[in-house]
């Protein structure tokens, strides 16, 4: 009996520690959220080195900060393209959220500024590359390896949700691996501060929760569904719902039917049935106990949540890095000259950036 009592006391203590941490974190976030500063650096402060990725309205480059010689990832967004693709609100959200959050498994924003043509977000550089490329290379991760990553996402979402933030874009491409083998969630382009429900259709087809597809108002529970998709994909090597056309993927998602590979253990299957749960009144993370239903589920029985948060657990995989500015874990992209207009574009739309 004694042993059980100490275990439950430990749980109570841990819960108290978490609550205190989150309360403090919320105060710090609220303060930065309200301040929402503009222009904290300039393009001339950085040497642009190489493109790490491209998107529909911009690119990400590794840069070196001239005064400190530190390396960063600079996200460059073309204002006119952002406006054309109706992503102004999303982009302002992204910058406002990034400048206010601070958590071990979330990428942090160090500087931001704009010029006549572009918006710039200078983020910490994470040299290990995307989880996506490592997962494709090895096929699938073992359950302990998958669990190590999943635990970090659980903690990151617990933090974000406590701040009334929905992430909405979980997928292996948006998870970077740092030099210690831990995760950093990147790309807050779809993140949003929401106290109740929201209706925007956004995300990646394979990872969309059924309520988003069905155009219902939805809440933070969409992130827990996406966690289920991610855990499945890490442990299987492919997502639970896939097809050639998005419409076929959506049909599978809303059907509520999931098939598991034979190598999945029973605890993993149980967790996934509770995360990939179409019925919101039954989905883990969305019930009375909140995130604790997930943290206390059997698949996570061996997880020391505090030790994960403190990065005290040895990572199952350390990416090869030749130094702080190494880009060998990223793909190569065609380089393009940065064109900056002589007149200011979209001043009104991005006044608060």
Curated annotation (Swiss-Prot):
Q: Which domain of life is it from?
A: Eukaryota
Name of the protein? cAMP-dependent protein kinase catalytic subunit 1
Q: Give the enzyme's EC designation.
A: 2.7.11.11
Q: Which SMART domains match?
A: S_TK_X, S_TKc
User: Which Pfam families does the entry link to?
Assistant: Pkinase
Q: Which organism is it from?
A: Drosophila melanogaster
Would I find ATP-binding among this entry's keywords? yes
- Give start-end ranges for the coiled-coil region(s): none
Question: What's the stated role of this polypeptide?
Answer: Serine/threonine-protein kinase involved in memory formation. Promotes long-term memory by phosphorylating meng and by regulating CrebB protein stability and activity. As part of ethanol response in the glia, mediates ethanol-induced structural remodeling of actin cytoskeleton and perineurial membrane topology when anchored to the membrane.
The catalytic activity, as recorded, is: L-seryl-[protein] + ATP = O-phospho-L-seryl-[protein] + ADP + H(+); L-threonyl-[protein] + ATP = O-phospho-L-threonyl-[protein] + ADP + H(+)
